[in-house]
Amino acid sequence: MSIRPDEITSILKNQIEQYQLEVEMAEVGTVTQVGDGIARIYGLDRAMAGELLEFPGDIYGMVLNLEEDNVGAVILGPYTHIKEGDQVKRTGRIVEVPVGEALIGRVVNAMGQPIDGKGPIQTDKFRPVESPAPGVVYRQPVNTPLQTGLKAIDSMVPIGRGQRELIIGDRQTGKTAIAVDTIINQKGQNVICIYVAIGQKASTVAGVVQRLEEAGAMEYTIVVMATASEPAPMLYIAPYAGCTMGEYFMYEQHRDVLCVYDDLSKHAAAYRELSLLLRRPPGREAYPGDVFYLHSRLLERAARLNDSLGGGSLTALPVIETQAGDVSAYIPTNVISITDGQIFLESDLFYAGQRPAINVGLSVSRVGGAAQIKAMKQVAGRLRLDLAQYRELAAFAQFGSDLDKATQARLARGERMMEILKQDQYQPMPVEEQVVVLYAAVNGFLDDLPVARVRAFEKDFLRFLRNERPEVLAGIREKRQLDDNLQEQLKKSIEDFKGSFTAAGES
């Protein structure tokens, strides 16, 4: 076989013309120590705080400690295959999560990856998990209500769009139930809801997701889940990721968003674990010195934006679990001081059958009053005062039986008011129905009913109004206040219904 130089030359020329020089530069470091979700890396002298690092096996980490001769990083995912001597690359990016409409109705992990088996999330939009809170000039006062559908909250501890309202109480007092009820009540209100589950059992979160699906609430809800079985870094990042997903709708689409963080006690514990493993100096209750900043930078991102930024809002409902009702512990006092009020749940009330178990005396809303509709203000002002007097008299009445008529009447009305504030789980109530029920209670229309029949009266009276007098409910819904004409109609409706209800009860 003869060698043809011209053919060889043409092949070589062709190869040279098609040759593309690709130089990939990467800053690489070496793992010197790894364990418990923490890695120490030597050689990444130019790494930034919060930067994303690439570990072998397509696992990422986040730089938290910048030290003299190494960096400390938390590993965002499984870390058992990472070993000493492995190479780690800088990415030059900070931690980002996917955002956008495609996430609505999905269950994702703290990195925004789907875990509900419904396929990949189709979005090309990303936002960094850490972003600065809007400044004072970019905000406007809270003035629009966010109805929870719970009589005790909407009347006495009202929440406005853009507010931060803490839900605090012992374990098993109904904290998650209040948050889930609030999400269900946003149906048809054009509010995007984000439920962030931090450090909970996977079975518990699955139950919440199922409940939301049954109520049709997953159509406007994103669930971000970092369960108890996941590494501490995932629990640490989860609430920031959820907040970022909400901020997209607030800033880009000018919509109202509700973000539930359930719960921040476990979030603080995860951060304490990371900080101690990174050898940061411990402070009170072994939490690091910046644990206040951990929660303040998250909750300050909740805001009601002014019209120049589109007027969207992000409302935060953080949850805190107390030990034996101790609200003066470190994390509870921190979060109470950051938020605009708190809903305090008591186990004694819960076990006594008062559900939701809200302690009205210790619960407060610092800005939500401005967001209440006028009709609710008209009935709720008296309600809080009457309940405060009832609690005082009830404590006093334990010591003596000789009570005058006026005191007995106050106690009787107080009992009926406490009864009317009870509400079944997953049964949120429209605000106009709350107003008519509370109007009947504060104006003494229930005083002559046996306490055991108060709930039945409420149920039947609302059915009567819906079927026989829908104009009363429609009037409150449209006017948002009780004018003289509406009050007359409402009084007449109560009296008409009460006659038939009392007669039915006696028969």
Swiss-Prot record:
Chief location bin: membrane
PROSITE patterns, per database record: ATPASE_ALPHA_BETA (PS00152)
Molecular function terms, GO-annotated: ADP binding; ATP binding; proton-transporting ATP synthase activity, rotational mechanism
Membrane topology field: Peripheral membrane protein
NCBIfam families: atpA (TIGR00962), PRK13343.1 (NF009884)
Subunit structure: F-type ATPases have 2 components, CF(1) - the catalytic core - and CF(0) - the membrane proton channel. CF(1) has five subunits: alpha(3), beta(3), gamma(1), delta(1), epsilon(1). CF(0) has three main subunits: a(1), b(2) and c(9-12). The alpha and beta chains form an alternating ring which encloses part of the gamma chain. CF(1) is attached to CF(0) by a central stalk formed by the gamma and epsilon chains, while a peripheral stalk is formed by the delta and b chains.
Protein name in UniProt: ATP synthase subunit alpha
